[in-house]
Regions:
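Canonical Rossmann dinucleotide-binding motif of NAD(H)/NADP(H)-dependent dehydrogenases/reductases
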Residues: 2-42
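A conserved hydrophobic alpha-helix of the Rossmann-fold in NAD(P)-dependent oxidoreductases
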Residues: 48, 76-83, 268, 304
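Hydrophobic positions on the long internal alpha-helix
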Residues: 94, 149, 153-157, 161, ...
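Catalytic loop of short-chain dehydrogenase/reductase
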Residues: 99, 105-143, 162-248, 259, ...
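C-terminal helical subdomain
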Residues: 152, 237, 257-265, 269-308
Length: 308
């Protein structure tokens, strides 16, 4: 179930979801390199253990592994029990685990990368979309993972974060989660009106989105449809709103969202603009932010920006 590469003497403890590869693995590396004890989580135990070994080969002996399926609330509870027993508290939670909500027909990724080499970002993204579909099942899984999964993990670990003298939550978001992608003005206003928005309302909107998706009513209702990735955009917008609600309800915690940029990961078929080292900077910055800093905010890479 779990494994580690070393000591428990480091003062601060962090959990990183989806930490076995790409951006998540790099966030783990940067945190561990700066003296934080890291609990790297992944759904696949073998891949998670291999990731810990990779970091161990870099001389990072302060990384532990624990299995976590963010879409399973009982899995999040097991992780919380492990953290409580081993460390007694949690200082940093990085909710990184996410899926695109699409199926791809790109075929050989290396050939695709060669085909799009030299194209600008918008053209590369357009070519990616041409090879993707958004079936209902994948859209449902996307909301379950990116929005509901983030909530489940956060709720399971919340009391441990409150046991820290400086609890921080960093939710890895996306430019696609900005409210500008909704065509319905009422959705934009409601999701941006945090004083009157509730978690229950977000859950209700999640159900409405899936119903409209199944009924073919996304465009008519005003959900994000232009350019594709509808479920991904909605899931990140809901995650952003949930983060802001949580920040309002728990002012002692520092809770922020970070868009890492268009990063060279498996999700982008390695055709992004930024390396994982560059993409992880914003998340690392907020994870290591001093007490009393920004909460309820959004970073575009490393710069504060609006949610709209």
């Amino acid at each position: 179930m779990e494994g580690s590469t070393g000591n428990q003497s480091v003062k601060e403890v962090a959990v990183v979801t989806g930490g076995n590869r790409g951006l998540g693995l790099e966030i783990c590396r940067q945190l561990a390199s700066n003296g934080v004890t890291v609990v790297l989580t992944a759904r696949d135990e073998k891949r998670g253990a291999e990731a810990v070994s990779i970091l161990g080969s870099l001389g990072l002996s302060n990384v532990h592994f624990h299995q976590l399926d963010v879409s399973d609330p009982t899995s999040a509870v097991r992780l919380a029990d492990f953290i409580k027993e081993k460390f007694g508290k949690l200082d940093i939670l990085v909710n990184n685990a996410a899926i695109a909500g699409t199926t791809n027909e790109i075929g050989n990724p290396e050939i695709f990368r060669q085909e799009v080499a030299g194209m600008d970002r918008m053209e590369r993204v357009k070519r990616m979309r041409e090879h993707m579909t958004e079936p209902y099942k994948q859209a449902e899984e996307c909301l379950r993972t990116n929005y509901h999964g983030t909530k489940a993990v956060t709720k399971a670990l919340l009391s441990l974060l409150q046991s820290s003298s400086h609890g921080r939550i960093v939710n890895i978001s996306s430019r696609y989660g900005l409210l500008r992608f909704f065509s319905a003005e009422e959705f934009k206003q409601e999701l941006n009106n945090i004083d009157n928005l509730s978690e229950q309302r977000l859950d209700d909107l999640s159900e409405l989105f899936m119903k409209d998706f199944k009924d073919g009513q996304l465009e008519r209702r005003g959900w994000p449809t232009e350019g594709g990735f509808s479920a991904y955009k909605v899931s990140k917008a809901f995650m952003n709103a949930y983060s802001r609600i949580l920040a309002k309800e728990h002012p002692s915690l520092c809770i922020n969202c970070v868009h890492p940029g268009f990063v060279q990961t498996d999700m982008s078929f390695q055709v992004g603009d930024l390396t994982v080292e560059e993409g992880a900077r914003g998340a690392f910055m907020m994870a290591m932010a001093p007490k009393g800093g920004m909460t309820g905010g959004y970073l575009n890479c490393t710069e504060f920006a609006p949610f709209v």
